[in-house]
């Protein structure tokens, strides 16, 4: 069997070989016992090439084993280079679909190793990555516990760049847990830390994106739109895939402030045309349904673009609210001509299941959206006329108020006379 040494010629040979042969050659290069500066440099190249090859073949488990195998090599190179290689391999595993659990395992192993080796700088960054993965995996309690400890440690060391990342993660985590005050507080902390240093455009875009999400959650869609626009510009300039999500949320804000007619114009703009695809098609379908006040079109959009609408938690929160509003408007319009009507007839007119319509009408009555009652025995909705306020009540209140003023005035005058 041919043995390959850590030389430039071997790297060139690996680059020319097919994937399987290249992987074998590169593994042998890493096993070369030589620790000369040249051999170390060649091994670093071999690690990069091997990562690329294993990622292409979607061999995530082999990447995890590679990271374990490289631990003795890490003692020969500077800590900064070790950190770069470790993060590079974790990033390589992340490129392989369906490896979230593997990434979590890998990060936990690396946290243990970095703790044993007292590599604080690398450990903190791997822990931040682990917290993000746990949040993605909906393991919120574990992620929050990890972040709570990490943020205190990083704040003490005053590593502001990492602190921005951690505060942003904490904001996203609290938002996922529906704790808006804490999400806003963490975002404010991230902005404060970011103001003291130079923040890379990608990180600034992430801050703007999170700001837009929180403003939209508070129904401040105009401010949310501004932040989403800033995030879109940052991500678009970098070619970051998050640009399409920023644009999608911009369109969502337009729909929520009843400016659905602007959606088509934004999509057909020079910037929008770059991102034409299912996400923008979904928002266009929702905008069309909203413009036409059509529940049928709205439901068709939710069905046809389930992945883009219902599976996106940000969009889903707002569209469920929009759907309720649209449903209420349609029901009010349909029952307006009647004083008594069968619920089945309303359900037929609106094209929704009977029990769904009955439940919604009951909720609207309780919320005082209209005056009425449900006769469930007869399966009817009885609508009452809006009670007209008797003018005598307002006149009586006005008279009492005037009498109060007179009494107060008399009291003041008598007090002056007595003094």
UniProtKB/Swiss-Prot annotation:
Pfam families: PCI (PF01399), RPN6_C_helix (PF18503), RPN6_N (PF18055). GO terms for biological process: protein catabolic process. Residues 217-388 form the PCI domain. One of its GO terms (cellular component) is proteasome complex. There is a cross-link at residue 160 (Glycyl lysine isopeptide (Lys-Gly) (interchain with G-Cter in ubiquitin)). Belongs to the proteasome subunit S9 family. This is 26S proteasome non-ATPase regulatory subunit 11 homolog. The gene is RPN6.
